[in-house]
């Protein structure tokens, strides 16, 4: 696994993706595959600007366990309060082992992810040309053994790989209803992003 060195705009050209909703987006070219910065603490200084992580509290007993995923208007869901202009959507996705779902990005929508079964390798990439972390990559391992919820702002590319031998389930909130025009895509194996989806420790 290569140590991640953030390219500089002076020595690496950026591939423009256009401006949407006032956000100028681009891909900052890399030449070596990388996991970027692996995030091991919710308050890591290496987090992409605007990305937030909050550990979920698990309350086990002899019947099973209880976990509160979100309180609308509180915590990471502080801005996810429905009103006349904001329509909140909650979704559940199940993904088979080894499947990669990436790279998605939005110019308007904010996502709040909570993997509720299995483990996922979450990929995040800052596409925002004027962000202080433009071009940065984060890798986050979350799910059963690390119950975190992850807030992903507009302009941050995202995706995940289902780890292990069982399907994973991911619950996610979005701060607006599904809008096909804001569902933007980049190939999961885009050569200029150069994210390393392979198993690292064999």
Question: Across the structure, where does each feature detected by a protein language model lie?
Answer:
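Conserved metal-binding segment of the jelly-roll/cupin
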Residues: 142-165
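Non-catalytic, conserved peripheral segments adjacent to functional cores
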Residues: 2-145, 165-202
């Amino acid at each position: 696994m290569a140590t991640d060195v953030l390219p500089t705009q002076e020595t690496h050209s950026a591939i423009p993706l256009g401006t949407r909703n006032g956000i100028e987006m681009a891909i900052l070219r890399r030449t070596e595959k990388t996991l970027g910065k692996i995030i091991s603490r919710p308050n890591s200084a290496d987090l992409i600007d605007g990305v937030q992580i909050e550990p979920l509290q698990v309350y086990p007993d002899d019947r099973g366990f209880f976990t509160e995923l979100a309180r609308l208007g509180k915590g990471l869901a502080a801005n996810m309060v429905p009103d006349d202009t904001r329509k909140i959507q909650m979704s559940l996705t199940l993904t088979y082992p080894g499947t990669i779902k990436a790279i998605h990005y939005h110019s308007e929508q904010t996502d709040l992810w909570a993997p509720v079964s299995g483990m996922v390798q979450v990929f995040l990439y800052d596409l925002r040309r004027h962000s202080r972390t433009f071009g940065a990559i984060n890798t986050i391992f979350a799910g059963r053994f690390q119950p975190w919820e992850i807030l992903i702002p507009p302009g941050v590319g995202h995706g995940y790989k289902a780890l292990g031998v069982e399907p994973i389930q991911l619950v996610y909130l979005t701060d607006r209803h599904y809008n096909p025009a804001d569902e933007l895509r980049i190939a999961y194996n885009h050569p200029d992003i150069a994210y390393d989806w392979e198993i690292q420790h064999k």
